[in-house]
Amino acid sequence: MSLYARQYGFPGAVMTAALQSHGELLPTTEAGIAEVNALEAFNETMPPADVPTEHFLHAGCYVRTCRIAAGVLLTSALIKVPTVVIISGDVVVRTDGESHRVTGYTVLRGMAGRKVAYHALQDTTITMVYATRNAVPEDCEPEFTDEYKHLLTRRK
């Protein structure tokens, strides 16, 4: 078990009733953002993981997909627009001091103002979708986050 898994309670997480019944990723509190930022800092001390990421526009929607291998910890940017989040796999979502295990195929309403961490227990695909008027995928990144310069699609 990794250090971050022990420290942040990833193992043994359960999909809480709130996430399961409401199907929402709520806005993250300041304390929750600080926790995910700490996970980001920890992640930066580790060898970089390969997280294939693709994005495109279709039918007025921006679609962004990350493929996370089992064992990989991925932290999200602070998302400033409401989105749909589609998860397929087995992953623990860490937000606001709570861990939620999501297995199989799940569609969630992602609220604006959220920043979460994902720890893949099995290979997992996460897709984010939101409506936009932009015509180029790269123009959507600053629209959905102020942290766009740190996104996987911006890394060289």
Stretches with model-predicted labels:
Residues 63-67, 84, 99, 107-109:
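Conserved hydrophobic/aromatic beta-strand scaffold that supports enzyme active sites
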Residues 69-71, 105, 111-113, 121-123:
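Tight coil/turn sites that cap or link beta-strands
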Residues 121-156:
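Double-stranded beta-helix
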Residues 1-65, 96, 154-156:
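A short, N-terminal "cap"/entry segment at the start of jelly-roll beta-barrel domains
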Residues 79-96:
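Glycine- and acidic-residue-biased ligand/ion/polar-headgroup-sensing regions
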Residues 54, 65, 75, 83, ...:
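Short, surface-exposed charged micro-motifs
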Residues 59-79:
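Conserved short histidine dyad/triad with adjacent acidic residue
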Residues 92-115:
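Short acidic-glycine-tyrosine-enriched beta hairpin
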